[in-house]
A protein has these predicted regions:
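C-terminal substrate-binding subdomain of Rossmann-fold SDR/epimerase-dehydratase oxidoreductases
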Residues: 1-105
């Protein structure tokens, strides 16, 4: 693809805190989206990963391949209106995850 599609990523600890928040606050709904409200392009994600891991090579995208859905972003309005928001941005989440992998894998 081109790297242009927009996506949303959520750090796993933020998901765990969201579940705890939902249970402790007795939030009831048929559907509760848990999102970061931070959308980034696949290109931005690749650049961020490249920076975190110290990769010095070139990022190559193949525009002959499909991009898929141009935008995937959750509507987290319900949970945000109750006072919960993700605390870990993408950059910090990648740093934490990469550090964990280096120490444990």
């Amino acid at each position: 693809g081109t790297g242009k599609p927009l996506r949303e990523f959520l750090f796993v600890d933020d998901l765990a805190y969201a579940i705890k928040f939902i249970v402790e606050n007795n939030i009831e709904s048929d559907l509760i989206n848990v999102g970061s409200n931070e959308e980034v392009s696949i290109l931005e994600l690749a650049k961020e990963i490249k920076s975190v891991v110290g990769f010095e090579g070139e990022l190559i995208f193949d525009s002959t391949k499909p991009d898929g859905n141009p935008r995937k972003l959750l509507d987290s309005t319900l949970l945000n209106s109750k006072g919960w928001n993700a605390k870990t941005n993408l950059s910090d989440g990648l740093e934490i995850t990469y550090s964990w992998f280096k120490e444990n894998i």
